[in-house]
Amino acid sequence: MAPQTFALWLLLVGTLLGQGCCQHWSYGLSPGGKRELDGLSETLGNQIVGGFPHVETPCRVLGCAVESPFPKIYRMKGFLDAVTDRENGPRTYKK
């Protein structure tokens, strides 16, 4: 009974992994991840433009009208790394 149960589990796991790892073809996607470029701009261009509401006033949440928050985060991280390097000395990395 154990070999039959083990074979059933292998079949089930193989089926689930096969479904999870397979490529989903949509919007003219061909094998190998290539797309037909002729109709792609027409198809996706209308969705992208129509998908975002047009706002007349600039965004004021977290100052995103001036600058995205991500560069600020990376500059702050660089500043904090420089300060900790001054206090603790340069970092040594093990291979």
From Swiss-Prot:
Swiss-Prot/TrEMBL keywords: Amidation, Cleavage on pair of basic residues, Hormone, Pyrrolidone carboxylic acid, Secreted, Signal
Keyword Secreted carried by entry: yes
Glycine amide modification, residue list: G32
Positions of modified residues (Pyrrolidone carboxylic acid): Q23
Signal peptide positions on this chain: 1-22
GO molecular function: hormone activity
Cellular location(s): Secreted
Name by which UniProt lists this protein: Progonadoliberin-1
